[in-house]
From Swiss-Prot:
Signal peptide: none annotated. One of its GO terms (cellular component) is small ribosomal subunit. GO terms for molecular function: rRNA binding; structural constituent of ribosome; tRNA binding. One of its GO terms (biological process) is translation. The keyword Transcription does not apply. Part of the 30S ribosomal subunit. Contacts proteins S8 and S17. May interact with IF1 in the 30S initiation complex. Belongs to the universal ribosomal protein uS12 family. It comes from Aliivibrio salmonicida (strain LFI1238). This is Small ribosomal subunit protein uS12. With S4 and S5 plays an important role in translational accuracy. Interacts with and stabilizes bases of the 16S rRNA that are involved in tRNA selection in the A site and with the mRNA backbone. Located at the interface of the 30S and 50S subunits, it traverses the body of the 30S subunit contacting proteins on the other side and probably holding the rRNA structure together. The combined cluster of proteins S8, S12 and S17 appears to hold together the shoulder and platform of the 30S subunit. The modification 3-methylthioaspartic acid is found at D89. The keyword tRNA-binding applies. Keywords: Methylation, Ribonucleoprotein, Ribosomal protein, RNA-binding, rRNA-binding, tRNA-binding.
Amino acid sequence: MATINQLVRQPRAKQVVKSNVPALEACPQKRGVCTRVYTTTPKKPNSALRKVCRVRLTNGFEVTSYIGGEGHNLQEHSVVLIRGGRVKDLPGVRYHTVRGALDCAGVNDRKKGRSKYGVKRPKS
């Protein structure tokens, strides 16, 4: 236990909280341009072809972002909106593209959980 004098001379160090999404720079979302759109395979024990894209953000960061939902219209030079949120079985993927914003279209024929995939309410 430190004495009062020791604490006066050198206060206790504040704990530094490290961000899980440093490229967002404390913003909720960031805009960026796709530099590469491709598929990659997840870690064991999962098996799939996950759709991801490399995005150059407006602040100069280049990040890998997951494209959720079935099917997408993204290609190189598409402008996308990026939010935080990692994909547990894809190492290095710490961001998601926002569906239904900018050049990224919503998911076709999506009926449930529409808000997460940029789909308007269907005409009853």
